[in-house]
Amino acid sequence: MKLKFTKMHGAGNDFVVLDGYTQPLNLTETQVRALANRHFGVGADQLLVVEKPTVDGVDFRYRIFNCDGGEVEHCGNGARCFVKFVRDSRLTDKRSVRVQVQKGVITLTMQDNGEVVVDMGAPVFEPVQVPFDASGVEARREGNDTLYALEVNGETRWVSVVSMGNPHAVQVVDDVEAFPVLVDGPVIETHPRFPQRVNAGFMQIVGRSEVKLRVYERGAGETLACGTGACAAVAAGIRRGLLDAPVKVHTHGGTLTITWNGESASSLMMAGPAATVFEGEIELAD
């Protein structure tokens, strides 16, 4: 079948975006992998699908598929591209839209300067809700946060566990460029303490309102940016007493700004760019 698509990116985190709102889409995992393949397909970190909502009071349903074909709960950089896509495609003329994701509803707002602000929801730190199996794990308090000891490649890594609708393990490192992200990342991603796997974040503190971040994403590997990862890292840093909002998060793909008041019931707000790269049509095997 022939499929129209739009290639987009948010701070270098790149996506294939599909309109499932005006046409029925029911892609298989094999088809998702084919689209995301950088050699034989379009190429992307994730595939984003716009659909009609299945709950009342929202504008759209937002579905995210990793390049390995698996569906995931949330993607912050994709959310910014999502609102640009639905506006550019004239599916809505609203500047602010409410969007259904797997674990709730988020609000996306297009700014006059072209950046998008995303209400990312409140972070969750309770291990069982991340989910993280904390039974018998060595732990220590730092500020208002709890750090857990993970054995990774023969070393002990102290991580904060956070859910931003998807699971994250965040650690602070001295030099994020020199740190073995590509070695430790896949080990943390598949650590047995995380039953749904996990996104592994590596954060270098530059100043109280500035960090550098690399994220090894669950099912995608290291990406140029990760919006939920940026939020998880900032939330952990604020709880540990290391950061003050707003925080500039520098990734390999660009800079995101994260704001949070430190209250567990309060949403994090993420601001950053969204860009269309090109539109096209691809022949996809049934």
UniProtKB/Swiss-Prot annotation:
Active site positions: C75 (proton donor), C226 (proton acceptor)
Pathway assignment: Amino-acid biosynthesis; L-lysine biosynthesis via DAP pathway; DL-2,6-diaminopimelate from LL-2,6-diaminopimelate: step 1/1
Site location (Could be important to modulate the pK values of the two catalytic cysteine residues): H168, E217
GO cellular component, one term: cytosol
Pfam families in UniProt: DAP_epimerase
Role: Catalyzes the stereoinversion of LL-2,6-diaminopimelate (L,L-DAP) to meso-diaminopimelate (meso-DAP), a precursor of L-lysine and an essential component of the bacterial peptidoglycan.
Name the UniProt record assigns to this protein: Diaminopimelate epimerase
Gene name of the record: dapF
